[in-house]
Amino acid sequence: MTPLDLWLSRSIPMCLLLQSLVLMVLCFPSASTCPKGCTCQRSESPPHGLNVTCSLSRLKEIPPDVPPDTQLLQLDRNHISLVPDRIFHGLRMLRRLNLSHNAVETLGEGAFIGLEGSLEVLDLSYNRITSVHKDAFARLKARVVVDNNPWHCDCALQQALGGMAHNHERVLCRSSELRDQEGQPFMAVDADLCNLAKRTTDYAMLVTMFGWFAMVISYVVYYVRQNQEDARRHLEYLKSLPSKPKKPDEPEDISTVV
């Protein structure tokens, strides 16, 4: 066997082994790619993304190292209280996101940036959400589940949910801009809460302006009366002065003829 044949006989198996290792790295996630406390499994159905399950893992925050090819992310039943802006940016394949049974209290404008084109289901039920930014769900095509939260029904919530086609009859108003709507379903709020807030602001401005106007009028009245009182006292003082006696040869009227 020539040296060339010997080299080829050894190099070809090595090349095949190297190719196999590369394919395994590309096609199957290694243990280091899965967030701590979670399990990752490759989906058998197209597009063969990852199913990442972090349920009941006592997480206090959303893992920042979720693999970019994740298509299902289960974060339910943890202690997550905050959804940072752009935390899911880069998860372009994510279809289902489960954040139910956590301690989230509010949602900012950029909480779900990057999921507009892929997300199909977003579950936020059984949290502590009272308020959201009016654009928190903007451009999302997903079915958003937000029931069983202590909502404060205001203009921002009406703007956030009003343009969505999904039914929110189970969203109850724990508190509301309208007192008679407290404890009622959000869908039963017929009033325009945004116009209500605007009218409330207008009324406050009118009351403030009326108060200032009343103060100015009161000052003017006080100033005029004070001047009248000073003038009256001055006139009484002048009247109290003794008159100058006339001289015998002084005429009654003095006229000047030009």
From Swiss-Prot:
The UniProt entry, under InterPro entries, shows:
Leu-rich_rpt (IPR001611), Leu-rich_rpt_typical-subtyp (IPR003591), LRR_dom_sf (IPR032675), LRRNT (IPR000372)
For whether the record's keyword set contains Transport, the answer is: no
One of the Pfam families matching this protein, by short name:
LRR_8
The signal peptide stretch is 1-33
Q: Which residues form the LRRCT domain?
A: 149-196
- The answer to keyword Glycoprotein applying to this record is yes
Q: Keywords assigned by UniProt? A: Glycoprotein, Leucine-rich repeat, Membrane, Repeat, Signal, Transmembrane, Transmembrane helix
Q: How does it sit in the membrane?
A: Single-pass membrane protein
Residue span, LRRNT domain: 34-68
Question: Where is the major localization of this protein?
Answer: membrane
Q: Where are the LRR repeats?
A: 69-90, 93-114, 118-139
Q: Which residues are glycosylated?
A: 51, 98
Location in the cell: Membrane
- Belongs to which family? Belongs to the LRRC3 family.
Q: Which PANTHER family does this entry report, sorted A to Z?
A: PROTEIN TOLL-RELATED, TOLL-LIKE RECEPTOR
Q: What is this protein called?
A: Leucine-rich repeat-containing protein 3B
Organism placement in taxonomy: Eukaryota, Metazoa, Chordata, Craniata, Vertebrata
Q: Which gene encodes it?
A: lrrc3b
